[in-house]
Amino acid sequence: MENHSKNIKIFTGNSHPELAREIAKALNIPLGKAEVGTFSDGEISVNIKETVRGCDVFIVQSTCSPVNNNLMELLIMIDAFKRASAGRINAVIPYYGYARQDRKAKSRDPITAKLVADLLTAAGADRVLTMDLHAAQIQGYFNIPVDHLLGSPILAKYFVEKGLADRDDVVVVSPDLGSVTRARKFADKLNAPIAIIDKRRPKANVSEIMNIIGDVKDKVCILIDDMIDTAGTITNAANALKDLGAKNVYACCTHGVLSGPAFERINNSAIEELVMLNTIALPEGEGLNKFKSLSVAPIMADAINRIYDDEPLSGLFQD
């Protein structure tokens, strides 16, 4: 890519500095110099170590766990760049936290996804670049441009290269009714049929498998979802598929939130491999043999380059 180092700057908070470094490398520019830490009382401290006057600034920060710290880091960084006279301030949020609170599910619930959008705008963001929002309509919560990239083409490419396209024994499985559209588009890229798991969720983070619609016996099954949190849904689905005679079970998602018992559940499940995008950093350590992480840095860098050059991003939105 053309070197825009005089006018474009990539900065990062503490949520995912490795991804920010990958994006900067793909753009052939150095990562911007900033110190983001905390004062002794826990307040967040931001110190920009280079001039950004008139520059296009891109702040890479997923609002994953610890969600509130990462969100406040992002807001304070946006404010710092605004007061440092940055030309345009772009919030690059690979994983947008609070996206599941996008509506009033019951009386007196907040709509926190809208609140976060308002906070980002009030802080001074001029644009948001994100990937696979849990609810696509969150784009409408903003009064600034939102570029919404899709992760499924990256995941589909991985399975095509793995030799799982154009085969009679492969089926793409939606883990719930809400993911059917995603599963269908994903299946089209593999030229595979789909199956659907009808589940009932008695309470938050608890799922129960009810029925599987479609033929999975002696099939290689690929489960796809936008995110995996406590992994109850995906592991229950995988075990149910195996019980019904599935030959192999793979799973994939854009966002590996992986909170609570997720790692234990996945390692003890019928899932042979879980493929995720690195919108959230995968923790280091043992017990990760089933986990595969694919980088979103190339598509993020391409999007950033197009934003800087005022070129259309429509070619990146194709699912």
Curated annotation (Swiss-Prot):
Pathway: Metabolic intermediate biosynthesis; 5-phospho-alpha-D-ribose 1-diphosphate biosynthesis; 5-phospho-alpha-D-ribose 1-diphosphate from D-ribose 5-phosphate (route I): step 1/1. SMART domains: Pribosyltran_N. It comes from the Bacteria. Mg(2+) 2 binds at residue 176. GO terms for molecular function: ATP binding; kinase activity; magnesium ion binding; ribose phosphate diphosphokinase activity. One of its GO terms (cellular component) is ribose phosphate diphosphokinase complex. Keywords: ATP-binding, Cytoplasm, Kinase, Magnesium, Metal-binding, Nucleotide biosynthesis, Nucleotide-binding, Transferase. PROSITE patterns: PRPP_SYNTHASE. It catalyses: D-ribose 5-phosphate + ATP = 5-phospho-alpha-D-ribose 1-diphosphate + AMP + H(+). Binds 2 Mg(2+) ions per subunit. Pfam families: Pribosyl_synth, Pribosyltran_N. It is found in: Cytoplasm. Its main location: cytoplasm. One of its GO terms (biological process) is 5-phosphoribose 1-diphosphate biosynthetic process. D-ribose 5-phosphate binds at residues 201, 225, 229-233. Gene3D superfamilies: 3.40.50.2020. Its cofactor is Mg(2+). Involved in the biosynthesis of the central metabolite phospho-alpha-D-ribosyl-1-pyrophosphate (PRPP) via the transfer of pyrophosphoryl group from ATP to 1-hydroxyl of ribose-5-phosphate (Rib-5-P). This is Ribose-phosphate pyrophosphokinase. It comes from Clostridium perfringens (strain 13 / Type A).
